[in-house]
């Protein structure tokens, strides 16, 4: 297994205008992340990949393409979580066969699952695949809030490496790192990387790293070295960029910026807005020229 610490891009997926996967474009996005953004790894099949709007077959295709293009150049994490446990297991087996370094799974959502049910979900995926697991905690979208003791129950399984922590509860983050220092934490909010690194996270997984990965690494390494003031200046610039991206449409804007960099990033998957308006295109161009 490769080192899973450091900067991981939450991989975008290029779609054609009809919603089908644009394989050439996806390969270009993978290459751009590795060759230009110099990332340590890719988190494939997450929210940024518009995963929850895709069929099982499409998810598998994305895992295959990303692995073929990345080869063994960087670490690869496959997000296989689903409200359908059978699908999660099927995807987990497939990604494991492809050679992904670890699986990750979002907490089951929509229905109000008990913690016992959530624990069973993770235990089942691990038992059926034999691969490592990274819990994907994103409470503001799933409604699932777990405390230190509940994470501890999940961590009792030696295959659970840690958590992708996409939450603003930094008290919980600090308590987790203190209670379980040997378990990894990846920061999930790009705009709060500096305080997260100050609290001891081991890496970060972010959507904006597809275009802002070099700055993300600077923040991470400066903060780790105790150069907080320098890291803060870069975080300020990063957050100005993120503010502009969010106001213009997150995934769509990142894709348009990539296109301006010569990457065939394609369209978004409906029911998201698939194609940028002239105004959105102008904003993307302005952000690229100002920040990248």
From Swiss-Prot:
GO terms for cellular component: cytosol. Its EC number is 4.1.3.3. SMART domains: DHDPS (SM01130). It is an enzyme of class 4 (lyase). Disulfide bonds: none annotated. It is found in: Cytoplasm. Keywords: Carbohydrate metabolism, Cytoplasm, Lyase, Schiff base. It catalyses: aceneuramate = aldehydo-N-acetyl-D-mannosamine + pyruvate. GO terms for biological process: carbohydrate metabolic process; N-acetylneuraminate catabolic process. The active site is at 136 (proton donor), 164 (schiff-base intermediate with substrate). GO terms for molecular function: N-acetylneuraminate lyase activity. Pathway: Amino-sugar metabolism; N-acetylneuraminate degradation; D-fructose 6-phosphate from N-acetylneuraminate: step 1/5. InterPro entries: Aldolase_TIM, DapA-like, NanA, Schiff_base-form_aldolases_AS, Schiff_base-form_aldolases_CS. Pfam families: DHDPS (PF00701). Aceneuramate binds at residues 47-48, 166, 188, 190-191, 207. Catalyzes the reversible aldol cleavage of N-acetylneuraminic acid (sialic acid; Neu5Ac) to form pyruvate and N-acetylmannosamine (ManNAc) via a Schiff base intermediate. Homotetramer. Belongs to the DapA family. NanA subfamily. This is N-acetylneuraminate lyase. It comes from Histophilus somni (strain 2336) (Haemophilus somnus). The gene is nanA.
